From Swiss-Prot:
SMART domains hit by this protein: AAA (SM00382)
Transit peptide start and end: 1-97
Assembly and interaction partners: Homodimer.
Domain of life of the organism encoding this protein: Eukaryota
Chief place where the protein resides: mitochondrion
Name under which the protein is recorded: ABC transporter B family member 25, mitochondrial
All residue ranges annotated as the ABC transmembrane type-1 domain in the record: 143-445
Annotated compartments: Mitochondrion inner membrane
Every ABC transporter domain range: 479-713
Record key words, sorted: ATP-binding, Ion transport, Iron, Iron transport, Membrane, Mitochondrion, Mitochondrion inner membrane, Nucleotide-binding, Transit peptide, Transmembrane, Transmembrane helix, Transport
Length: 728
């Protein structure tokens, strides 16, 4: 019986296995009501008009979507190393929580802000390195051209209020007295040289607006290739690096957390490039130009109004945004919790029905919805306060400027066109400033997300090639374990000085109780882990001193729990050797006794197997895995309890295929059922990480030792189960 399972009896009923293992989490969906809908939509549209058109998202290539585990006082803890997102699994006990908290607070108060700022600058420098590709002149030209279009767009944008002012003044003079028109002509000689009529000025106004928009679109078109290539390069590098990390790292991390880091990090790069480079910087340039123009044309008072209003607007927006961030976090957490609860309930649909607990599930789900509702209301109220405060600041500045303009008009120092121009310049600043809060919040979050992704690149694998590693030279496939010690945690030995030999071309079964270290032996031979001490050799070569790719290409593994890609059957078999021909794939399927079954499917080899192969039966999945290993044609075969979860008929079919696969190959079988072990040339019996017996099946039975006990126990269990079934 597998771990976490029970046989449950009830009056008149025999209920089959109840799996007590926790269900794996899957990516949560969002049902958010979007309380920031107006601001969110406006900001999204603004970014869409002024930045990269597409927002690439790296699809989930891993399976889970769970958050990283939080620290807890237990013998196992996650230790954060320098420039690491999360630490490896260590054995030291967690210190006193109070002491840890005190030390953490002391460190944070002295260096967290400066360290964070330095880390942010390092991230931006790293990103700049991807943008300014020294070995790619085309991309450097695109960056320079985009900056040129950026400046051109802002220069033309500032001309729009000027042209509108001139048109208003000209029309006002033309409808007034002759003296007014003469005065206008005398004060604007250049205008009359360029434009013949007020209509021509208005046409120029339209051309300036169109030109500004055209420059913005050209900037986007020129720069988008650079931005998208940057996202692609970083994402591919991180993805490849994750595959280069060792198994210990992946066992200490939740796969969904890694997926979310890459997904959020790639989107963060897109945001930083679009919002920061093409919106924040242009806004700063435009504010400087507008302030300078107002100071030059109308005096320092107007420049002060602009500068003070913009400064107040920024300070107020950043302060309120920082304050309301906690409400957004609470809302997002409630959203995630509700989504997780809903999905967890739905994937356990049958369990809910078995116990008639639909009402309970609905009530629990509603509790999470209530938390989301409360947090969303707080977010909405704080957003209303932010919008109202921004409106007061901007309206005050605009009204003050209009009052000064009206006084200037009454005094004869300004014209109606000047009032229109000042109004237009200030309104041009209002659009990007309206989204300052969103830009600030998203920028801070983007830097955090980018930091998490770039820190993945600083993770180092414990399993690497040595500097003088050589390819594995096979001379038959003789395997030798010599006094091997290994432990995942120092206080718990997994392998305690084991030694045995698998002769070339022979098969060895490894048996023992759960936790005795059987599967660990296969992992160490494949070099997912290195020994704490002792040596593992293949044909006399220490596997630590050979290249990983040559070692792993020589070994084929048939796991107990076969996981297939959510693709076609053909792809899953072909994955064993990507250079194989179509006919070789079919031949591998025949040897695994799965070809006829596949041929009876409506889509044959094009049948999609579903996520993790769940559309296939257990036996079909195992035979697809066998076909994949047949196609790889390794010199060494490792088989980890491949038939433990199968019925007797399917087990017999799989064993026949395994015999064919193991023929003339060095093979190691982890045997849960001793009927598998008895067919091997040699049997190694493990107990508490040590080899307690070794020899052929008949010889071990004759010794009446540990193997004989296991054999008797297994046969007795089968007899008792048969008797129980007959009693029913």
């Amino acid at each position: 019986m597998s771990r976490g399972s029970r046989f449950v009896r009830a009056p008149g009923l025999l209920l089959c296995r109840v799996n007590l293992q926790p269900q794996p989490k899957i990516p949560s969906f969002s049902y958010s009501l979007r309380s920031d809908y107006r601001l969110h939509n406006g900001f999204s549209n603004y970014i869409r008009r002024n930045s990269i058109r597409t927002s690439p998202v790296i699809n989930a290539f891993l399976s889970d979507n769970s958050p990283s585990p939080s620290p807890s006082p237990s013998p196992i803890r996650f230790v954060q190393r320098s420039s690491m997102l999360n630490g490896r699994l260590f054995s030291t006990s967690t210190p006193n929580p109070d002491q840890t908290t005190t030390k953490t607070k002391e460190i944070k108060t002295t260096s967290s802000d400066s360290d964070s700022a330095m880390a942010d600058m390092k991230i931006l420098r790293t990103l700049a390195g991807y943008l300014w590709m020294r070995d790619n002149p085309e991309f450097r030209f695109r960056v320079i051209a985009a900056l040129g279009f950026l400046v051109g767009a802002k220069v033309l944008n500032v001309q729009v209020p000027f042209l509108f002012k001139l048109a208003v003044d000209w029309l006002a003079s033309a409808t007034g007295t002759g003296a007014s028109l003469t005065t206008f002509a005398a004060t604007n000689p250049t205008l009359l040289t360029v434009f013949a009529t007020p209509a021509a000025v208005l046409i120029g106004y339209g051309i300036a607006r169109t030109g500004s928009s055209a420059f913005n679109e050209l900037r986007t078109a020129v720069f988008s290739k650079v931005a998208l290539r940057t996202i692609r390069s970083v994402s591919r590098k991180v993805f490849s690096h994750l595959h280069d990390l060792d198994l210990r790292y992946h066992l200490s991390r939740e796969t969904g957390g890694l997926n979310r880091i890459i997904d959020r990090g790639s989107r963060a790069i897109n945001f930083i490039l679009s919002a920061m480079v093409f919106n924040v910087v242009p806004t700063i340039l435009e504010i400087s130009m507008v302030s300078g123009i107002l100071a030059y044309k109308f005096g320092a008072a107007f420049a002060w109004i602009t500068s003070l209003s913009v400064g107040s607007y920024i300070v107020f927006t950043l302060a309120v945004t920082q304050w309301r961030t906690k409400f957004r976090k609470a809302m997002n957490k409630a959203d995630n919790d509700a989504s997780t609860r809903a999905i967890d309930s739905l994937i356990n649909y049958e369990t809910v029905k078995y116990f008639n607990n639909e009402g309970y599930e609905a009530e629990k789900y509603d509790q999470f919805l209530k938390k989301y509702e409360d947090a969303a209301l707080q977010t909405q109220r704080s957003l209303a306060f932010l919008n109202f405060g921004q409106s007061i600041i901007f309206s005050t500045a605009l009204s003050t400027a209009m009052v000064l303009c009206s006084q200037g008009i009454m005094n004869g120092q300004m014209t109606v066109g000047d009032l229109v121009m000042v109004n237009g310049l200030l309104f041009q600043l209002s659009l990007p400033l309206n989204f300052l809060g969103s830009v600030y919040r998203e920028t801070i979050q983007s830097l955090v997300d980018m930091k998490s992704m770039f820190q993945l690149l600083e993770e180092k694998s414990d399993i690497t090639n040595t500097s003088d590693a050589k390819p594995l030279v096979l001379k038959g496939g003789n395997i030798e374990f010599e006094n091997v010690h290994f432990s995942y945690l120092p206080e718990r030995k997994i392998l305690d000085g084991i030694s045995f030999v698998v002769p070339a071309g022979k098969s060895v079964a490894i048996v023992g109780t759960s936790g005795s270290g059987k599967s660990t032996i296969l992992r160490m031979l494949f070099r997912f882990f290195d020994t704490d001490s002792g040596n593992i050799r293949i044909d006399g070569q220490d596997i630590k001193e050979v290249r990983l790719d040559s070692l792993r290409s020589s070994i084929g593994v048939v796991p107990q729990d076969t996981v297939l890609f959510n693709d076609t059957i053909f792809h899953n078999i072909h994955y064993g050797r990507l250079s194989a021909t179509e006919e070789e794939v079919y031949e591998a399927a025949r040897r695994a006794a799965i070809h006829e079954t596949i041929s009876n499917f409506p889509d044959k080899y094009s049948t999609i197997v579903g996520e993790r192969g769940l559309k296939l039966s257990g036996g079909e999945k195992q035979r697809v895995a066998l076909a994949r290993t047949f196609l790889k044609s390794p010199a060494i075969l490792l088989c980890d309890e491949a038939t433990s979860a199968l019925d007797s008929t399917t087990e017999a079919e799989i064993l026949n295929a395994l015999k064919a696969l193991a023929s003339n190959r060095t093979s190691i079988f982890i045997a849960h059922r001793l009927t598998t072990a008895m067919q091997c040339d040699e049997i190694v019996v493990l107990e508490n990480g040590k080899v307690v017996e070794q020899g052929p099946h008949d010889e071990l039975l004759g010794k009446s030792g540990r193997y004989a006990q296991l054999w008797t126990q297994q046969n007795s269990s089968v007899d008792m189960l048969d008797a129980a079934i007959k009693l029913e």
